[in-house]
Amino acid sequence: MRSGSLGKYVKLADDYKLSYFEVILVSSRQMVKSESEEPSLRLAVLIDADNAQATVIEALLAEIARFGEATVKRIYGDFTANASSSWKKVLQKYAIKPVQQFAYTTGKNATDSALIIDAMDLLYTRKFDGFCLITSDSDFTGLAMRLREEGLTVYGFGEKKTPDAFRNACHKFVFTEILRSNVASKSRESPTETKAKKKTTKIKTAVKEVEQKPEFPEEFVLSALEQSVDDTGWASLGVFGSYLTKLQPDFDSRLYGYKKLSDLVKAKKNLFDIEERQTSGSSRKVLYLRAKN
């Protein structure tokens, strides 16, 4: 141990009346804690009950957990209406706070207004790093843009019918059809599936929707890769993935049948050269890629 470090520990022991061993033990624990724990993003999850499906809530919250901690979970809608009955069954289980909003005027969406007002109130608390907006409604485009202007990260979740304006206003947009396919797969493995034919029909429909994969945007992906490479002509997978999302927030490898971006890259051998490189001072390997000549 260096003399400078030794002097620091001796001073701590004198100041706090601790033994030298106790100071070393506490300091080592703090060092391990600081190195192993990365701060998680504090996220506000706001759900538009009129434009979201309760059937995907478990998969939705699991997806959100990939981005950070759902510190606030609220859902907005008229829960006296029959259309919201499916949501009422899951609110308590997933600790989601319902915000009742009656339709005061025909033709006006009071739910949208309530959600936007709450979002702005939460924004000005300065307690959050980002927002998760669960809706397929383009009326929230302005809200997403406002949150971004304040420096917060915006994650959007909605169906494929969601207008481009809202999807592109988010930093990242996830299609709920992808999450629905996860629910369908689990349900098919469950022995309770045979109890209701209606459930089986819904499952098959959900799977069919996802199996109809869109055409792979080869030109867009290669163009993004060209902008991601360094001076050597290679790009790390992380840099490439980040650039893809910036250009097209709803880009998701799962839409094309691959669980992760790395799986997609490895499968497209006709498009990419790939290398796994050891990072200095670590056993971890990083995937690098470039376009094939």
Q: Where do the PLM segments sit?
A:
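Helical mechanochemical/support elements of P-loop NTPase systems and associated helical scaffolds
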Residues: V45, Q53-V56, L60, A83, ...
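Intrinsically disordered, low-complexity linkers and terminal tails enriched in Pro/Gly
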Residues: S19, L25-S40, L179-P214
